[in-house]
């Protein structure tokens, strides 16, 4: 049976860590004309809530599945995998990535997050739409799982670097998948320097324009992650520059369709964020809090001796009891310790 025509194609654009106040300022200063045009022709909702913890892997999985971490099983930026008896680190910082192993961290982020960690009991938006024969497309987004097999890119100029980092295996993703030069289902001529910050939004804009020009999707997840990296460097009140870069990526897509009016004749657009940010004025050192406990180290020479695994993740942290025979006592002691730490608002 032929697939019934869709009324409009949908573009879901996600600007990582976008602050509404900064979006308003970027528009006011004339730095975001594409976003302004979309806002003026649509509905602008400023008071949205993110998931908890509000970090990118958890929020990305929530957006892709419609579920919270208890159901989609991506619990944090850093967590302890009981089945494999090790830490999982998705790249919370360069220092953390080095501590837990660069190759391991990259492999967990690119492969395991989708193929092993993300719950199989909950379908992603790509799987739902693939099942309905709706053409899906995805740029560099953490959660890309779908039904289409993609082998690593053979055309990328970064192929040898990718192979050296163990990116040699296929994945299953959206029908059209473009992930940081590692996977590209079409020869678009677009590159992102292996997903380097500052290049990813431009890559998304380039790929998006190609997909629109060639009519290759019904649903496109248009990922714009560079605002997050810029915010960490310049502060959350310095987003105007990175919002302008995200706007240019959107403008490329609109331009290739003949302008905003022509684009909106055939496309519906949702622009959103996964979470936002605030300035960090104080920090909590969990290593000091648990100085008297035997905490599992990233490359622990004697892991069986560890009592606790401690997993900080910027806005929250998780503590795991590793000694099954003393789990109850260890959890109670950890909760008491954390309740006395200045800066810890909630222990659950």
Language-model segments: residues:
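Short alpha-helical segments and helix-capping/turn motifs at coil-helix boundaries
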Residues: 21-22, 44-49, 120-129, 203-208, ...
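Glycine-rich, histidine-containing beta strand-loop boundary motifs that form or position
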Residues: 12-15, 49, 138-142, 223-224, ...
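His/Asp/Glu-rich, glycine-adjacent segments
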Residues: 67-233, 321, 339, 346
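A long, amphipathic alpha-helix that forms part
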Residues: 4, 198-220, 227-269
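Short secondary-structure boundary/capping segments
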Residues: 27-30, 152-156, 235-239, 283-290
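Short, solvent-exposed loop/turn segments at secondary-structure junctions
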Residues: 17-20, 53-54, 69-70, 142-147, ...
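Secreted, luminal/periplasmic, and some membrane-associated catalytic domains
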Residues: 6, 15, 46, 53-55, ...
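Short, structured active-site-proximal loop/turn typified by the sulfatase FGly-forming signature C/S-X-P-X-R
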Residues: 24-78, 137
């Amino acid at each position: 049976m032929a697939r019934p025509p869709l009324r409009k194609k949908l573009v879901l654009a996600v600007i990582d860590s976008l602050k509404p106040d900064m979006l308003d300022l970027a528009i006011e200063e004339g730095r975001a004309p594409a976003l302004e045009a979309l806002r003026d022709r649509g509905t602008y909702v400023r008071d949205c809530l993110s998931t908890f913890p509000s970090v990118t892997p958890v929020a990305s999985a929530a957006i892709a599945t419609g579920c919270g971490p208890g159901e989609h099983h991506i619990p944090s930026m850093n967590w302890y995998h009981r089945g494999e008896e090790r830490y999982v680190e998705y790249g919370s910082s360069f220092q953390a990535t080095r501590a837990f192993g660069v190759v391991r961290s990259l492999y967990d982020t690119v492969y395991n997050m989708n193929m092993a960690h993300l719950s199989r009991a909950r379908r992603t938006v790509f799987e739902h739409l693939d099942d309905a024969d709706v053409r899906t497309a995805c740029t560099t987004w953490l959660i890309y799982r779908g039904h289409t097999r993609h082998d690593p890119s053979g055309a990328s100029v970064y192929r040898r670097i990718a192979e050296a980092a163990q990116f040699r295996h296929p994945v299953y993703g959206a029908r059209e998948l473009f992930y940081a030069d590692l996977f590209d289902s079409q020869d678009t001529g677009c590159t992102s320097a292996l997903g380097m910050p500052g290049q990813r939004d431009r890559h998304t804009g380039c790929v998006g324009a190609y997909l629109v020009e060639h009519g290759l999707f019904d649903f496109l997840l248009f990922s714009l992650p560079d605002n997050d990296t810029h915010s960490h460097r310049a502060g959350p009140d310095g987003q105007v520059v990175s919002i302008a870069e995200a706007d240019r990526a959107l403008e490329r897509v609109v331009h290739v369709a003949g302008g905003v009016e022509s684009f909106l004749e055939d496309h519906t657009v949702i622009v959103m964020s996964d979470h936002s940010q605030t300035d960090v004025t104080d920090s909590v050192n969990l290593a000091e809090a648990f100085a008297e406990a035997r905490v599992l180290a990233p490359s622990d020479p004697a892991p069986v001796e560890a009592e606790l695994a401690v997993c900080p993740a910027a806005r929250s942290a998780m503590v795991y009891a590793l000694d099954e025979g003393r789990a109850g006592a260890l959890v109670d002691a950890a909760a008491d310790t954390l309740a006395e730490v200045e800066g810890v608002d909630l222990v659950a």
